[in-house]
């Protein structure tokens, strides 16, 4: 299943995100404002996000077929953004980077194609829509 994929931020763009948002600092800091969540404790770099969605893995037809509960990223169409700022295309074209799932697959840090539901999500989290964009449940 998808959650058995290892978290391997293989691209610079996810490494850039994780340089601040590693689960220990800047948990809810974005959009030019300081977050309110403060964490204390020992160093947990590399483990803090292990219970979150994996990143840095190849999401392709072979994975979708083997998993059985994922949409084929080359045929499933999704719409990211909201209002006048939307883009429609396959999962591969709108959410993946060189065929890999990265932080920016779901989060739009430049706020160009956000769904307006918080967390800078490209697809609304209402009714688990962001999850159902890829997961066939």
Per-range role (PLM):
Residues 1-137:
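C-type cytochrome heme-c attachment and multiheme electron-transfer modules
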């Amino acid at each position: 299943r998808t959650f058995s994929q290892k978290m391997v931020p293989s691209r610079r763009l996810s490494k850039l995100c994780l340089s601040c948002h590693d689960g220990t600092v800047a948990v809810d800091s974005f959009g030019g404002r300081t977050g309110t969540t403060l964490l204390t404790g020992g160093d947990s770099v590399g483990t803090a996000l292990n219970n979150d969605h994996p990143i840095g893995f190849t999401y392709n037809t072979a994975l979708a077929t083997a998993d059985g509960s994922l949409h084929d990223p080359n045929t499933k169409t999704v719409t990211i953004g909201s209002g006048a700022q939307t883009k429609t295309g396959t999962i591969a074209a709108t959410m993946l980077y060189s065929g890999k799932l990265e932080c920016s697959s779901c989060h739009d840090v430049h706020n160009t194609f956000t769904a307006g539901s918080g967390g800078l999500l490209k697809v609304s989290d209402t009714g688990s829509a962001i999850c159902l964009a890829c997961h066939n449940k």
